[in-house]
């Protein structure tokens, strides 16, 4: 009996060690996600290993939440930065939305999971069309998840992008968009998209000098080595918005 228990414990330990090894591999792949990229497209083999390893690590209850967070985060990264054919987009977005929703239901207090879910749900709703998204309650769900997670970037974008529709969608408010996007930048000045989204709002407000100032501030931050692809694309968006504003000013 004693020998049996020792053997059983040994197998259990091996299982936990294997799962934790999967987590270690996955984290290493995530850290190296920009290596061997072509342009702003990540290496597909590394991304697949990262996703598969996080999924395997989820079997270890002791690291399940951390592994689940890594899993949905890596799926979101792959959707944004790994090349796939255009006809695959709908299936991949459907999968990202479903998986992140399940993860959010299990770990509703995890802010990283909530951010991915709100972002995926927002993109999913946008693909279905604004009216359908509103009727099915997708827009309100995005807002509610963002509020719970204090995700000011997603919340501010929702207030800015979504149309005010009396009796149907009465909560979008561009004054609140200003409040939340400003908060997002204040709380995380390292994320270039916080400069970009607030600059877009300033453009909409015809505050061109303020928009250009935000763009300059964002571009001056350079590129973070641990967010290389994300910041590289963020800089591209900032420069494109800068061109758009300058072209508008040149016409005056």
Language model region names:
Residues 28-52, 73-109, 116-147, 155-186, ...:
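Short coil/linker segments at helix-helix boundaries
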Residues 61-64, 109, 190:
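Short helix-capping/linker turns of helical repeat alpha-solenoids
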Residues 70-71, 116, 154, 197, ...:
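Canonical tetratricopeptide repeat
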Residues 200, 207, 216-252:
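A cross-kingdom marker for long, charged
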């Amino acid at each position: 009996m004693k020998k049996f228990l020792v053997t059983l414990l040994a197998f259990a330990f091996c299982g936990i060690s294997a799962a934790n090894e999967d987590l270690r591999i996955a984290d290493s792949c995530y850290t190296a996600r920009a290596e061997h990229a072509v342009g702003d497209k990540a290496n597909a083999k590394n991304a697949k290993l990262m996703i598969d390893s996080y999924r395997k690590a989820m079997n270890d209850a002791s690291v399940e939440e951390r592994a689940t967070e890594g899993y949905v985060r890596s799926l979101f990264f792959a959707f944004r930065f790994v090349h796939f054919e255009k006809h695959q987009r709908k299936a991949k977005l459907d999968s990202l939305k479903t998986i992140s929703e399940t993860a959010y239901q299990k770990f509703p207090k995890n802010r990283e999971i909530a951010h991915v879910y709100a972002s995926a749900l927002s993109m999913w709703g946008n693909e279905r069309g604004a009216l359908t998204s509103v009727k099915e309650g997708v827009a309100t769900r995005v807002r509610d998840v963002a509020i719970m997670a204090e995700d000011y970037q997603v919340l501010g974008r929702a207030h800015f992008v979504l149309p005010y529709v009396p009796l149907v969608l009465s909560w979008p408010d561009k004054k609140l968009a200003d409040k939340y996007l400003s908060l997002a930048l204040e709380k995380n000045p390292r994320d270039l998209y916080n400069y970009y989204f607030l600059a877009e709002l300033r453009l909409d407000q015809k505050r061109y000098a303020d928009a250009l100032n935000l763009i300059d501030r964002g571009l001056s931050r350079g590129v973070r080595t641990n967010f290389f692809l994300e910041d590289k694309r963020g800089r591209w968006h900032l420069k494109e918005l800068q061109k758009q504003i300058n072209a508008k000013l040149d016409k005056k």
